[in-house]
Regions:
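Noncatalytic, beta-rich nucleic-acid-contacting surfaces in large DNA/RNA-processing enzymes
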Residues: 6-10, 14-264
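Short, well-ordered junction/capping motifs at the entry into regular secondary structure
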Residues: 1-2
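Calmodulin-binding IQ motif helices
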Residues: 267
């Protein structure tokens, strides 16, 4: 695991542009993105969530924090993001989810998977709508826009006598009055679409218990081994306790016929 040097760590506190550029340089590597975001949080730099009205393709500095770059969301291409940014610049912010779909519909990279991942990653949260509501209606909204475009191409007139070829927007699709996803469900969605937990961390409720059990933060161990004068607190072969979420695990038999487990733990 790569760690920033102490000089770089000090730099990131006062130079958020440096960290934003560093994150943008590893956009295609979710493990590296997660690593550098952890460094940002250690430095006290806030990670701002993805937002269709504020995010760019890469990570950018905003209000003392770093805004999440949309390229880091799965199934979101640069062409789609650049079109989105042009529409914002030319016609102003997207006013609603349906306004976003209407204005972005003719983008060649616009598809249901891209829209769904924007919803699941929280990129529409600032519009004060629930992710559960958008997940319920997004396909209906896109299908309604497609049907409206088809009718316009065919030259059909609406009740107000719009000329053939004009873009008659479909009626606003009402949002169902349903509960929002739980915090755990939202975090799981974020992890699936970005490789990261953005709105929180599943371990947050267990950190106090982990400390009581004597669990050692992994960054404390790594910092000790990366110190210029060598490890002081820890040593090779030492048994320690850590706490985290097991994301993958497999067992194997050693040459001595002993059973061992290899686990990937997200902390």
């Amino acid at each position: 695991l790569h760690l920033l040097s102490r000089r770089q760590r000090q730099m990131c506190i006062r130079d958020r542009e440096y960290m934003a550029a560093l994150l943008t340089s590893v956009l295609d590597n979710s493990d590296k993105v997660a690593e550098y975001i952890a460094e940002c949080r250690d430095c006290g730099i806030e990670l701002l969530p993805p937002d269709v009205n504020r995010s760019s393709d890469g990570f950018t500095v905003e209000d003392g924090g770093i805004r999440f770059g949309l390229v880091a969301i799965k199934n979101i291409g640069r062409g789609f993001i650049q079109t989105m940014m042009r529409r914002r610049e030319q016609d102003g912010p997207f006013r609603s989810f349906q306004d976003f779909c209407q204005r972005m519909f003719d983008c060649t990279d616009m598809n249901k998977r891209a829209v769904e991942n924007l919803i699941r990653s929280g990129a529409f949260d600032s519009m004060k709508v629930r992710r559960s509501q958008l997940i319920q209606v997004f396909e209906k909204v896109l299908d309604s826009i497609a049907e409206s475009r088809r009718k316009n191409v065919e030259g059909q007139l609406d009740l107000f006598g719009m000329a053939a070829g004009e873009d008659a927007p479909p009626a606003e699709t009402p949002l169902p009055d349903i509960p929002e996803f739980t915090a755990a469900e939202r975090m799981f969605m974020e992890k699936e679409t970005t490789g990261l937990y953005l709105s929180g961390h599943p371990m947050a409720d267990y950190r106090a218990l982990a400390r009581q059990a004597g669990a050692v933060p992994i960054h404390t161990i790594l910092e000790d081994f990366s110190a210029e004068d060598g490890p002081v607190r820890f040593a090779d072969g030492q048994s320690i306790t850590i706490a985290g979420i097991v994301t993958a695990s497999r067992t194997r038999t050693t040459r001595n016929n002993a059973l061992m487990a290899l686990s990937l733990i997200h902390i």
